[in-house]
Amino acid sequence: ALDLFSDLKILNFKSVKEDFRIIGEQVYTTDLIKNYVIGFQNRDTVIKEYSETPLFKVTTGTGFAPNNKNEGIRKNNFYGTYLLGPLLIRNPYLLEYFTKNLLKSKNVKYKAMLHDTAYQAYDAYLKNFVNKD
């Protein structure tokens, strides 16, 4: 998806096709929420040049390119990332952040919903793959 925006020149970055693939689970942090953001990447492009605000900082995995600790682009209400879905299902805290902000922009009060299974799956992933102690 980020490649499309690179070609359209809507945002200021350049995506380049490479001869290698970046495949695997990723763990990031963001200033949007205090919790980790988890996801999966499978791509053969890297971002070589960018001046947009990064969405994430790499904790484990790959950023825009190997040895780059930034990933994703954030500009106004646009959020772009190489992470594959189901991004919001795997990250209930991030889903809650976006839901609250969307409702707030429409002057609708947020009412927390019970989605214990999503939080349990998120916590289990972190326990098994990130905090292996």
Question: Which residue stretches match the model-derived regions?
Answer:
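Short, acidic Gly/Pro/Ser/Thr-rich loop/turn segments
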Residues: 18, 46-49, 86-90
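Hydrophobic, well-ordered secondary-structure segments
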Residues: 5-8, 25, 39, 70, ...
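Acyltransferase
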Residues: 77-133
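Cysteine-nucleophile active-site neighborhood
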Residues: 1-32
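Catalytic beta-strand/loop cores that center a nucleophilic Ser/Cys/Thr
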Residues: 27-76
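Conserved beta-strand scaffold positions in the cores of enzyme catalytic domains, especially
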Residues: 10, 39, 78-80
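Fold-independent oxyanion-binding glycine-rich loops
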Residues: 13, 42-45, 83
